[in-house]
Amino acid sequence: YTVSHGVDPSGKKVGNGFSKYIVTDLLRNRYGYNGVVCTDWGITHDYSSIEEADGKCWGVEALSIPQRHYEALKAGVDQFGGNNDKGPVLEAYRMWTAEFGEKSARERFERSAIRLLLNIFRTGLFENPYVDPDRTEATVGNPEFMQAGYEAQLRSVVLLKNRAGTLPASTRRSV
């Protein structure tokens, strides 16, 4: 949902999910991240009304949906948030093949597949794919876990604009 203005040395003004500088140059190369990169939700979609828009394809609005997928893949993205349609992804594969060749396309898609599958292997879903209903019932919705999650969310709140003078917080002021 974000565009990091003035950050990309190329001057491109695109959403971060379409930015090779953000995803590959910074996140992967500079900071060494090798996990899955999933786009913000719905940034490859077209929307006919603001009510249905959950993401925006900033900077690539003029591109087709398959072209947006292709641009995100070239940026280094592995997974498309909010997209359950394989069509644009397969078309992006064909675009990659046309530009860089079949070998390069396979290598690029396999790199993403490895990252995605590693998460499934690490959780043991291939070794033991069966759910233990008793254990699940004790875990899912566990009040202690829900409280810990809620507290983690409270600690992760970020103030983007300080228009109302919220910060610095006074010890005598309640928020």
Where are these regions (language model features)?
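Glycoside hydrolase catalytic-domain context in secreted enzymes
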Residues: Y1-V175
